[in-house]
Amino acid sequence: MKHSRRQFLTAGTAAALSVPAIKSMAQDGSLASGSDAIVRPPEGKTILLSCKLGMITREADGKKLSLTERLRMAGDAGFDGVDLDQAAEFTPAQARQAVADSGVFVHNAINHAHWSKRLTSANEQEREESITNIEHCMRVSHAAGGNGVLIVIGRGDDGPAEVTEERARQGIKRLIPLAALLGQPILIENVWNKMFYDHDAPPEQSAEAFVDFVDSFNSPWVGMYYDIGNHWKYGQPKEWLHSFGYRCVKLDVKGFSRAKNKFTDIGEGDLPWGDVRKGLSDIGFTGWATAEVGGGGVERLRLVRTQMQRVFGL
């Protein structure tokens, strides 16, 4: 009987984890029962629209908002779900309860400490803290019903390229077993971190180095969270999407102006959205697209959602 790589990883890692470890995850809410009610995203959509939790105001009418209230605000603005980019602030059980109470889907989790506690760091303790932070994100996303964690693996100036990449590779390899057990792909985002591109070189660079790094794991649990706006400065989005292919699991969405060398609202600037749509169609992309721009209350969120619908032709 033949097994897929996904089946092999799931079975192998479940067997490798100890009973106390699994019991601990059940107690903290990160290993939720399949019989529990889980909010599900809308069906029948090719691209699901999301915003970062960090875009949603923390206060309204002088009152601090709970996670449940902030998720509801995203739902009121018409988003299909939310990317929980403040995962460090919540336990898995808290995230799951907020999703259940709000009725709004959470598809992903992020811990922004990945900039200060990096997998590429020369400091071993920082690398260990990075792994712990990512594990927490996996548990939060899984408990909330999500299917992925976005990570920034580090900075290129942490050392020579071959050294920093190997540090990150070893850290991610340690994370794959938990990713497989919880069904949480590790999604590497392209950022201005001087890795897998030449930060000081002109545009029209390729995505080959990024693709090679992801392929080095030979694992279905490592993929890409493609930030469309981030690398418009350095390469053509349609060409990058063609290079990514099936590796591209989720999208971050913002605008960028090459002419003014600055980020913009979605649809502003000179990013070729027609090419983006063509590239996504060519690779058969379906999944989550998450806004990462300035946020606010419901009206601002509705505007952002409308901008996303326009650039994706929805």
What label would you give each PLM region?
Residues 1-78, 145-147, 198, 207-314:
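Histidine-acidic metal/acid-base catalytic patches
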Residues 11-21, 41, 105, 120-226, ...:
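Active-site acidic/histidine proton-transfer and metal-coordination neighborhood
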Residues 55-57, 88, 112-115, 153-157, ...:
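Active-site-proximal loop/turn and secondary-structure-junction residues that shape catalytic pockets
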Residues 70, 95, 137, 175, ...:
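Aromatic/hydrophobic pocket-lining residues that form π-stacking "cages" and hydrophobic walls in ligand
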Residues 83-100, 159:
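Glycine-rich, proline-tolerant flexible connector loops at the mouths of alpha/beta enzymes
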Residues 90, 99-124:
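Mid-chain, structured segments of secreted extracytoplasmic proteins
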